[in-house]
Amino acid sequence: MAGAGLIGIRRRIKSVTNIRKITKAMGLVSTAKLRKARVNLEINKKYYNEYKVILKDIINFIEDSNIYIDGNGSHKKLYVIFTSDSGLCGSFNINIINNVINEIKEDKENSLVIVIGQKGRMYLKKLGINTLAEYIEIPDVPTTKEARTIAKNIIKLYSSKEVGEVFLVYSEFYSPVKQQVLINKILPFTKENKSDNKYIEFNPPVTQFIDEILENYLKATILNCFSNSKASENGSRMTAMNGATDNANDLLDNLDLQFNRLRQSAITQEISEIVGGAEAQR
């Protein structure tokens, strides 16, 4: 009995040890990717914030009717969802999907979805939610190429009045252990008081380059979402893998203790049997 128990525990120890090697390696890889993602995030955030200020000044000077400010009359809402291509990142993806479900459940008929990432596509398919477009295999460091493709699709859907409002759903990165799902409305734009901008003069007129400005702003916004999403994903994965490694260490400690106790019990039993046999032969 003891021998069979020892073999079973030894197998479990080997299995948990192999799993620990995997989780530890994935944790180290995620740490390295997170470091790179944070650098990229800081660079993109500065560009995005500067562009946002410029766009605000430009929009406040548009006096003519414009669908990007006044709306296009459509009641459809578009949600662009940023998820990951890979799993094993804790609750990163499910938190985003749950926020989307809560947002669209009361108005499903007027809610349209574009999903970014394999995991988001998989979850939405299971839930029976159709998508207008899907973007997968996004690189660890997203570029303007990916952002431009998505921005052009958004502009096309909005300018053709297929959608009347556009929201970006992504995870904002604060630290490796803190991320928050945000739902940001990006179209139509909101005008603010332009009293502070009366000294600004645009040449050529704003209306001649508003489309180009809009596309560049959307690219900057989407790139900012990508950067936050990648940092959040790797932060969540690093935390999840480090937690899994710690759990594996605790389990190995318990298994080692069980193994040693069982082996000690087996040795004691063998000694007792030997002594008992010797006594019987006297």
Swiss-Prot record:
Main location: membrane
Record's subcellular location: Cell membrane
Highest taxon in the source lineage: Bacteria
Gene Ontology CC annotation, any one: proton-transporting ATP synthase complex
GO molecular function, one term: ATP binding
Any one GO BP annotation for this protein: proton motive force-driven plasma membrane ATP synthesis
Keywords for this protein: ATP synthesis, Cell membrane, CF(1), Hydrogen ion transport, Ion transport, Membrane, Transport
Database matches in PROSITE patterns: ATPASE_GAMMA (PS00153)
PANTHER family linked to this entry: ATP SYNTHASE GAMMA CHAIN, ATP SYNTHASE SUBUNIT GAMMA, MITOCHONDRIAL
Protein family according to the UniProt entry: Belongs to the ATPase gamma chain family.
Quaternary assembly: F-type ATPases have 2 components, CF(1) - the catalytic core - and CF(0) - the membrane proton channel. CF(1) has five subunits: alpha(3), beta(3), gamma(1), delta(1), epsilon(1). CF(0) has three main subunits: a, b and c.
Protein name as catalogued: ATP synthase gamma chain
Species assigned in the record: Clostridium botulinum (strain Okra / Type B1)
Gene: atpG
